[in-house]
Structure formats: C-alpha cells, structure tokens
Amino acid sequence: MTAGANASNPSIARSASNAASHVSALDVPPQTSRGSLIVLEGVDRSGKSTQCKKLVDYLNSTGRPASLMRFPDRTTTIGTMINSYLSNSTEIDDGCIHLLFSANRWEKKKEMEQRLSEGTTLIVDRYAFSGVAFTAAKGVQGMDRAWCMGCDVGLLAPDAVLFLSLSAEEQERRGDFGEERYEKREFQAKVREAFDGLKEEYKGRWETVDAGGTMDEVFEDLKGRVDAIVQGHKGPLGRLWSM
C-alpha cells in the first residue's frame, strides 16, 4: 500500500468525508453485556496515561471489570520499532512509520474483541485518532487525512472518545516535555488542528475535557463521563471508518 495510490483512491476519500457514516455495525448480534470501548486522546503531556490508569482502578474497585490498553503498545515487535523511532534512536520513512502505528493497533484487534465480548471495559490510551492526527500534521504530500484513515478501516470503533484539551503553555510546563520526537511546540499546534477536524467528524461520540485542572479535578470530570458511558445502552460493536 503506497501513499500515492491510496490518496487517489476515491473510496477512501469518500469514507473519510462523513464521520456520521464512519461507524458501521459488525455482523454480530447486539451484546447488552459487552464491555465499553473508551478512548482517551489528546496532545502530548495532557495526562492521558495517568487518567487511564486511575479510571481502570476506579471501575475495577466498583465491581465493573476494566483493563488498560495503550497505543503504541511498545511491548510487541512492531511496538519496539515504533519506540526506537519515537525516542529518536532510528529514522523511519513517514509513510512506513504511519503503517507501523496502524499495524500495532491491528495486532491487538482480536484481543480487544475478546475482552469486550467477555464484558470487560477497555480504557485505551491513544488510538487511531492519534495516528491520523500526528501523520496528517506532518503535511507530507500523499498522506492527507483520507489516506491516514484508510489504514485503519475495519478497526473497532470506540463507544466514546474523551479528548483531554490542554493549552500549549500548560503543556510545555509539564515535566519531560520535549523528550520525544513529536514534542515540539509548532508541531503540537498542527496536531491540535488535526484533532479539531476529527472532533467535528466524530460528533456524538467525542467529548472534550479540560485537562488544565489538577489531576483530581480532571479525574472527577472523567469519572462522571465514564460512568454514564459504561451504564448506558450499548448496541453492537462498530468499525472504523466504513460507509
């Protein structure tokens, strides 16, 4: 799969043009007892990893089975390659690294389906939305949002995306900012813009959370939202970004 070929593929372009149609039901009957698939997204250093862990601990403590998943999953062979790139140890072509990020999500798809079908709620630290936003923000010819989305067609669609919003000033004040490849102010601004576009396309399942407060304040906000999602009615699992 090449960037040029997919960028000109009209079916992918159509798939990326209307988020209201991005989620389609899997060919399985509704499972009222399935777990919820909740994704936390946001710019770097917005506190996603900390909040994901706190949410999993909270759900389990209240008798609702929950597990944490992170993308990239740096424990796999593919994840090890991604980690080397992010830590600036190796250089990888922009198209290739995007495909590796996507492959890292694909290799966990069956595990995610299994856990959800068993009634476990998954709290996911980054997902396909980050993959699209970070690559699209690079502005590389042939790697527009439609191409980026095409690589993840068929992955599980989350019940909700909770986006942790943080100002550039607050982001840079947080510890360790700048250690990884993408942690540059100008680039993070472009990532924000890319996320804004995804937010508009994923209306109804995307909630913006102010991450500028204390850790406990943000957690209380997230906890209420997650309670509503987990307790709410869930239809059959869907897939990204199909018509």
Ranges and model annotations:
Residues 62-153:
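ATP-dependent small-molecule kinase phosphotransfer cores
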Residues 48:
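Conserved lysine of the Walker
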Residues 45:
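Walker A (P-loop) phosphate-binding loop of P-loop NTPases
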Residues 2-31, 54-56, 169-243:
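NTP-dependent small-molecule kinase module
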Residues 40:
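Hydrophobic anchor at the beta1->P-loop junction of P-loop NTPases
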Residues 51:
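Hydrophobic positions on the alpha1 helix immediately C-terminal to the Walker A/P-loop
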Residues 64, 156-160, 202-205:
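Short glycine-/polar-rich loops that comprise or flank the Walker A/P-loop
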Residues 126-194:
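A glycine- and Lys/Arg-enriched "phosphate-lid" helix/loop adjacent to the NTP-binding pocket
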